[in-house]
């Protein structure tokens, strides 16, 4: 079964909520018992989304929502008119699953940025999981290919073609017939297409190798010769529960800031997304604590919301502290209302004794 591409915020939320359910369903099943690292599982909880762990579906949803909003704002203001979406995958970033600890994401980010040097771009690293790595690494065990998805704007197709040609001449994609640098112009639903960049791993892949016969003509001799060309076709299917352990291990120390990349005008977009997501996650965490205190009948004094606290730190001459605290109280109250209407995660339901729907 093919997974529907994520090209809207609504699809993004549904896909990551489903991923959250699948992970926890597997964790409490007989097949998944003791498979997922116990020290990693708390990082997947909604209450710990504030840690910005890249494999936490709730963290991803907040970051995607902020990216969607900030990109729409720039489209409305005319700062972004149309865009190109670029995919970059290189053989040097492919490893067997037993060798994944040797990945240096900082180096990969710098390498990806160099491919788009002097351009305005915003995007993220993603890990493609191959359940049979033989065609890529000559090893039967699963393999991982770190690659990048980027939105590039304020450039031309001609310039991107030059960059594409230069990159593809210097670097291999890692499978026969593959291209390291690929791009496509996108003029509609740009913010929706950007959601694909922000997703957590949703699928797993396989590669089938085959031979293609092609005739060549030698103009000097007039001879026609048939040659064989190595080719590869990739197949995709929804991520299987048995693959969760490898994916969770892969992302065990990865935060959102480790995989997001930007250059040129994209740096301000990245900054806006990270800051607004951090504030939203802090507000949500505060609301969760307030709701928990209210549920067990304990008194609750809200802490200042992140932006309000930042204002307080500027000094009394720049901020009216009582007013700021009232604002923080309002923020938490609003967040509590959102929280009450939001569905609980599977583990939170498990802790409360609520049956998880199958």
Residue ranges of predicted features:
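Right-hand nucleic-acid polymerase module
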Residues: 1-143, 154-358
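Conserved RNP beta-strands of RNA recognition motif
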Residues: 147-152
